[in-house]
Amino acid sequence: MNNYLLKCENINKFYQEGENQTQVLKGVSFSMEPAELVAIVGSSGSGKSTLLHTLGGLDQPSSGEVFINGQSLQKASANELAALRNRYLGFVYQFHHLMADFTALENVMMPMLIGHQNKTEAKDRAEKMLSAVGLSHRITHRPSALSGGERQRVAIARALVNNPSLVLADEPTGNLDHKTTESIFELIQQLNQEQNIAFLLVTHDMGLAEKLSRRLVMQDGLLKEGA
């Protein structure tokens, strides 16, 4: 178990709407090793985002189990689950979810401050991460003064500020043009190689997915290895 950074076993997820029950995830099992770069591809409604939220402990499966670094998310208390997410995971979404009234630096510092870490250390770490994503010259700018690509880079820096082992990214380039998408992907590759951070990307962009070393295909709630 401990050889894997992430492992899920027979994950099922049902949603109940009145008398109707819909199964979104159907016996999903797979694993990731440290520093691996993996894409999950599939059409809208195939269950990709639901799986990602389940893997990150943001949603609970109806049955099955998820392990992060050998520790079960389902057996963890609420406080233990929060600590696991804070220690091992970073999250990036299609929409950056930056706080409009805060600068890029303050947005990136926020996860560390929420974790009650020293403000000076948080500032130093946030500056380092913004530099790593090529935004050291934009740290005092608010989101409204940044381009779409710059906002997503800030979101990536925020995901990295607690030095996670794994970043879960849900359509991280879904709102970006082709050129900006390429630059964000190059950044992800660079961070993967230089900092040994694993990335699990959910995307419908096959061109992007084909550049990753491993692809998984989600279809009708089933997950299988891609070509």
From Swiss-Prot:
E.C. designation(s): 7.6.2.-
Database matches in SUPFAM superfamilies: P-loop containing nucleoside triphosphate hydrolases (SSF52540)
InterPro entries: AAA+_ATPase, ABC_transporter-like_ATP-bd, ABC_transporter-like_CS, ABC_transpr_LolD-like, LolD_lipo_ATP-bd, MacB-like_ATP-bd, P-loop_NTPase
GO-annotated biological processes: lipoprotein localization to outer membrane; protein localization to outer membrane; transmembrane transport
Transmembrane segments: none
GO molecular function: ATP binding; ATP hydrolysis activity; transmembrane transporter activity
Keyword Transmembrane helix: no
Subcellular location field: Cell inner membrane
Protein topology in the membrane: Peripheral membrane protein
Pfam annotation, one family: ABC_tran
Keyword Cell inner membrane carried by entry: yes
Protein keywords: ATP-binding, Cell inner membrane, Cell membrane, Membrane, Nucleotide-binding, Translocase, Transport
EC class (word): translocase
GO cellular component, as recorded: plasma membrane
Binding site for ATP: 42-49
Residue ranges of every copy of the ABC transporter domain listed in the record: 6-227
Family: Belongs to the ABC transporter superfamily. Lipoprotein translocase (TC 3.A.1.125) family.
Function in brief: Part of the ABC transporter complex LolCDE involved in the translocation of mature outer membrane-directed lipoproteins, from the inner membrane to the periplasmic chaperone, LolA. Responsible for the formation of the LolA-lipoprotein complex in an ATP-dependent manner.
Subunit-level organization: The complex is composed of two ATP-binding proteins (LolD) and two transmembrane proteins (LolC and LolE).
Protein name per the record: Lipoprotein-releasing system ATP-binding protein LolD
Native source species: Haemophilus influenzae (strain ATCC 51907 / DSM 11121 / KW20 / Rd)
